């Protein structure tokens, strides 16, 4: 039986590069790497991709990522430039909507088949709001967990630089735990309030998705019911590639 071709999807964020190899609509393998050379090493033992697409909010790595993909004799298509997103942008500055938010909108609407809110926990906590017709209509941006912890360290004399971790309790009994309680519980409160406000203002029956590296730390504390979607951005990149590179695509 003939196998579907392998397609590589890349999400180049501010602090890391995530990648997934797809066959048809299924993910074969995923990885989080620091740079293009680590991506090349990860791909070495996987089926060679016959197509590749990326969303990038870090232009400095685009050339090196494209070079890795060119090893397979294919061209890396970047969402929003080489690769159309086909997402209506009902915002005041459509040219400033990040490629990762376009990818989230594509995948969330594909999954929900209706209005959706994506909460993406990365360097920033980004809220992407998708209308009942699949348009990106805006959202909100708040500091991410590691960003908040780093700011506490940088803007104070004595608070240490620590890594994100689940807080042990609602009350921190030492400095590190107190920082984790404040940042993680604070983020959960921000998520609940913003999602509630969006629902109250727009009156849509939203499906909510949690994505991004720190979603599993915040989700247990949130009141907001959400579907966990750790690969949502990569799914959106793959969907965009598939729509424009299938044999019958114009």
What are these regions (language model features)?
Residues 83, 124-125:
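Acidic, glycine-rich active-site loops and adjacent beta-strand->loop/helix elements
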Residues 1-12, 26-116, 133-250:
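Nucleotide/phosphate-binding catalytic cleft detector across ATP-hydrolyzing
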Residues 17-21, 118, 125-130:
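Short beta-strand scaffold segments in enzyme catalytic cores
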């Amino acid at each position: 039986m003939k196998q579907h071709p392998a397609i590589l999807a890349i999400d180049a964020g501010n602090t890391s590069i995530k990648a997934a190899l797809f066959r048809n609509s299924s993910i074969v393998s995923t990885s989080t790497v620091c740079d293009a050379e680590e991506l090349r090493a990860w791909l070495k033992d996987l089926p060679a991709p016959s197509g590749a697409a990326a969303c990038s909010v870090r232009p400095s790595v685009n050339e090196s990522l494209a070079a890795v993909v060119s090893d397979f004799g294919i061209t890396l298509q970047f969402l929003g430039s080489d690769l159309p997103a086909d997402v209506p942008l009902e915002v005041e500055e459509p040219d400033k909507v990040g490629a990762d938010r376009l990818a989230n909108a594509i995948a969330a609407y594909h999954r929900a088949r209706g209005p959706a809110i994506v909460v993406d926990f990365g360097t920033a906590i980004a809220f992407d709001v998708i209308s009942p017709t699949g348009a990106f209509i805006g959202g909100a941006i708040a500091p991410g967990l590691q960003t908040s912890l780093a700011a506490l360290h940088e803007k104070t004399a004595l608070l240490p630089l620590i890594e994100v971790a689940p807080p042990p309790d609602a009350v921190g009994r030492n400095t590190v735990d107190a920082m984790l309680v404040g940042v993680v519980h604070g983020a959960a409160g921000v998520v609940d309030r913003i999602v509630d406000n969006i629902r109250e203002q727009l009156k849509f029956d939203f499906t909510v998705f949690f994505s991004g590296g720190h979603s599993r730390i915040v989700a247990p504390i949130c009141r907001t019911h959400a579907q966990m979607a750790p690969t949502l951005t990569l799914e959106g990149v793959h969907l965009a590639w598939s729509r424009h590179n299938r044999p019958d695509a114009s």
